[in-house]
Amino acid sequence: LSGEASRILFDYSAQAVAMQLEVDGMWENMPIMDRQNGDMMLAVFKTLAHLDPVERQIRQTGEFTAKLEQIEKVCSMESQGTPTGERVLIKFRAKKDPLKSLSDLGCRDITLNSFKKWIGIYQEEGPTITKGLIIVSAPENGGGLSTVWRCALSAADRFMLDFVAFEPDGSNETSVENISIKHYGAESGLEAIPTIEKAVLREPDGFVVPEISDPAILEALCDQILTMDRMAVVSVNANSASEALAKVCALGVSAEKIAEVFSCSLNMRLSRRLCSTCKQPFLPHPQLLQQLGLPQTHVQELYQQYQPNPAEMGEIPPCPQCDGRGFKGRIGLFELLEVNDQIKQAIISQPNPATFHQIAEQSGMVSMRQDGVVQLAQGTTSMQELQRALA
């Protein structure tokens, strides 16, 4: 609870319990636990989550709150029987998320200011844009989509513009101040399209749909943008801004309609931050700086993860700040693909990530690699970590 762990995985076999901890997106093996103590621990977790401790085969989900001093986290638990025993995954989520804005995630002003233009923030130069389709994305499996989604919506003027979100029953992705949530599904007995049609009567300024996958919902949003000058913000899992746009294009709505409503696509990947206490400077080779596009006159040194002297291994205690990992926390790497005539034409004729990315870079988009190189030059991350994050 006191560290940066986001998930813990338990694999129960007949004799023991294997455990893994995810810290800053990387899985670490933990000491093996004997089955007897593991069973007692699991019974406590299931009881706290209001699950059946005796049931070891049927899938169960629940959550509980854990508190350690001033740290309070919501623990979402999922258990499922396996041929050899049981697998249990617990996800940790801070009750009060310290990351409230895109700036908190590491989004630089050049990208943030452009994104704010599309999401309805007043501009000193040019008209304020209050219509269009905005896509927010991040990789799947812990890539940060929920976090960047909330932070992206927080960039909007939610006091001047009225937003309403649509989510399946049981989902609460859009927990953002001043955005009301309308649920639909079997539990509520409501269907998505009638729910949207009813919300339209309120005449909101914008619609919000996380992890969109239903072509009918996307079609309804596009129609609202075209006929009523509304704004729509959706999210998908994707590795790049261009891939996110291609995924939305592949949902089945006519390409001409997507081309007419599309505004921008914001994508984030997460890179681990070097520990500020133990990171080590080194002199980069001039050829490396040239490959990175960094002027040698401005960048004299880069930083890397702490490399202990082999002769001192085991003698020096690990860094108290990062517990010897060399990294502490994560930072977002961003890219923003903005609409232009070439992008519109590509949506209609060649809706694929490679084409979108090529056009965007030719039009001046700051690519995720370029954003990462800035973080590298500032000593925020390492060359090896940047390569891993962009792979």
What are these regions (language model features)?
Residues 1-391:
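Short, flexible helix-loop junctions that flank or precede catalytic/ligand sites
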